[in-house]
Amino acid sequence: MPHSSDSSDSSFSRSPPPGKQDSSDDVRKVQRREKNRIAAQKSRQRQTQKADTLHLESEDLEKQNAALRKEIKQLTEELKYFTSVLSSHEPLCSVLASGTPSPPEVVYSAHAFHQPHISSPRFQP
């Protein structure tokens, strides 16, 4: 019995039968959705990690800021103290009262003999 031309033609056909085409499209859709779901999950994880990192960095910067503000306050207090010491010393200082400009070595050496203010326990190392 000879083969019908329909059966020989279908063996050389490149497109699957209509039922199989729908099935392979469904498989591709499912695979694409799964791939997209995984990509979205990874993206959310990266976003969460970035937010956590920024939060930790923010906390660290807040601590640094607080420490710097504390240091500014301390230095401001020291400036007030030394300004007060200088103000009380100026009227008693013969080197500063002379009015003639002196080299820094002379001024500092002359002042090395009377420094009761700097020996204050407040500013000892």
Curated annotation (Swiss-Prot):
Annotated SMART domains: BRLZ
Upon changing S43D, the result is: Retains the ability to dimerize with JUNB and localization in the nucleus but abolishes DNA-binding
Q: Does the keyword Cytoplasm apply?
A: yes
Compositional bias, Low complexity, is annotated for 1-14
- Compartments where found: Nucleus; Cytoplasm
| Modifications the protein undergoes after translation, according to the UniProt entry | Phosphorylated on serine and threonine residues and at least one tyrosine residue. Phosphorylation at Ser-43 inhibit DNA binding activity and transforms it as a negative regulator of AP-1 mediated transcription.
The segment annotated Leucine-zipper runs over 54-75
Give the recorded effect for L56A.
Answer: Loss of function
InterPro entries recorded: AP-1 (IPR000837), bZIP (IPR004827), bZIP_sf (IPR046347)
Q: Name one GO molecular function term.
A: DNA-binding transcription activator activity, RNA polymerase II-specific
State which tissues express it.
Answer: Detected in postnatal and adult lymphoid tissues such as thymus, spleen and lymph nodes. In thymus most concentrated expression is found in the immediate cortical layer. Differentially expressed during T-cell development in thymus. Highly expressed in Th17, Th1 and Th2 cells and in activated B-cells.
Region annotated Disordered, chain positions = 1-59
UniProt main location, coarse: nucleus
Q: Name one Pfam family in it.
A: bZIP_1
Extract the ranges annotated as region (Basic motif).
28-50
GO cellular component terms given for this protein: cytoplasm; nucleoplasm; nucleus; RNA polymerase II transcription regulator complex
What range(s) does the bZIP domain occupy?
A: 26-89
Q: Which residues carry this modification: Phosphoserine?
A: S43
Q: What is the effect of changing T48A?
A: Decreased phosphorylation
Q: Which UniProt keywords apply?
A: Activator, Cytoplasm, Differentiation, DNA-binding, Nucleus, Phosphoprotein, Repressor, Transcription, Transcription regulation
Q: Which PANTHER family match?
A: BASIC LEUCINE ZIPPER TRANSCRIPTIONAL FACTOR ATF-LIKE, FOS TRANSCRIPTION FACTOR-RELATED
Q: How does it assemble?
A: Heterodimer; mainly heterodimerizes with JUNB. The BATF-JUNB heterodimer interacts with IRF4 and IRF8. Interacts (via bZIP domain) with IRF4 and IRF8; the interaction is direct. Also forms heterodimers with JUN and JUND. Interacts with IFI35.
Q: What does this protein do?
A: AP-1 family transcription factor that controls the differentiation of lineage-specific cells in the immune system: specifically mediates the differentiation of T-helper 17 cells (Th17), follicular T-helper cells (TfH), CD8(+) dendritic cells and class-switch recombination (CSR) in B-cells. Acts via the formation of a heterodimer with JUNB that recognizes and binds DNA sequence 5'-TGA[CG]TCA-3'.
Report the family membership. Answer: Belongs to the bZIP family.
Which named protein is this?
Answer: Basic leucine zipper transcriptional factor ATF-like
Look up and give the organism this protein is from: Mus musculus
